Design a protein with these regions (language model features):
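Conserved, well-ordered alpha-helix/loop/beta-strand core segments that scaffold catalytic motifs
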Residues: 122-155
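Alpha-amylase-like alpha-glycosidases and glucanotransferases acting on alpha-linked glucans and related
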Residues: 2-130, 155-277
Length: 277
């Protein structure tokens, strides 16, 4: 919900910063068909070349240190989670060793040391993404262009948000949801839909004044000029189905936080423009 996609890091900018050479970029296979994106190839080669750039980067730079301090609320968990995902072959976090799955502090500390370099690499990628994004936004705004950011209501089950904040979601002891978000049958789909995302425990979120949502909104306000809230109606009432359901026919409607959450978000939104969907 907070991190940027390293796929969007402009490698040419890394060349300008002296972290890469053009010949190094051309030495990788990025696909041969301009109309077809080979994401598997990009996944492997993108991270290989970003690691080359990281090997020449100084993690002691003032800008980098300022970014990591400012973003620490989410960056440390995200970087550890991403490093662990790669270390364990990209399997879902619910299948990790139980101590890590359950964020046992001794296990977390051990892997923070083991994967220190990988964790710093993840922080480097986020630093480069956000630096470039803010430069792009500034350029667009200076020419009268505003950016609309799409913010979905739910997050994926296999995500750092769920791993690091299990208490905020309706989950089984092993971290897997027994109910997931979906859509009831309607004119567009007679069988309904199963989205697969875990649903929030709104009662728990309310206890700290929806702090996670406020932080999420503040982060998005920096990135975009207008925020589009996808599935806004899910804040009023939401539809869930069994996690193993094949379709959305046999679901259940529940009451959402409604005005309690929107009032909390208004506290941080100020004059921010929002599109509701």
């Amino acid at each position: 919900a907070f991190a940027g996609n390293p796929y969007l890091i402009d490698l040419d900018d890394l060349v300008k910063d002296g972290l890469l050479q053009e010949t190094e970029i051309r030495s990788f296979n990025w696909g041969t068909d301009d109309a077809d994106i080979d994401y598997a190839t990009i996944y492997e080669n993108r991270y290989k070349i970003l690691r080359m750039a990281f090997s020449r980067f100084s993690a002691k730079s003032e800008d980098f240190l300022a970014f990591t301090e400012k973003s620490d609320r989410w960056l440390s968990d995200y970087s550890l989670y991403t490093a662990l995902k790669r270390h364990f072959g990209d399997i879902e976090w619910q299948s990790w060793d139980v101590p890590l799955r359950d964020r046992d502090q001794e296990a977390v500390k051990e892997y923070q040391e083991i994967l220190h370099n990988d964790i710093m690499f993840c922080k480097f990628c986020q630093y480069e993404f956000f630096k470039q994004w803010m430069q792009l936004k500034q350029y667009a705004n200076s020419r009268g262009v505003q950016i609309i950011g799409d913010m979905p209501l739910y997050v994926a089950s296999d995500s750092v948000d769920v791993w690091a904040h299990r208490e905020m979601f309706l989950l089984e002891p092993d971290g897997r949801p027994n109910v997931v978000a979906g859509a009831a049958p309607d004119a567009f789909s007679e069988s309904g839909q199963v989205w697969g995302s875990p649903v929030y425990d709104w009662n728990v979120m309310e206890e700290d004044g929806f702090a996670w949502w406020k932080a999420r909104m503040l982060e998005n306000m920096e990135l975009f000029d207008v925020i589009r809230l996808d599935h806004f109606s899910g804040l009023v009432r939401y539809y869930t189905v069994s996690a193993d359901a094949e379709d959305g026919r046999n679901g259940k409607w529940s009451k959402g936080p409604g005005r309690k959450l929107t009032d909390a978000m208004t506290e941080v939104l100020g004059d921010m423009r929002v599109i509701v969907e």
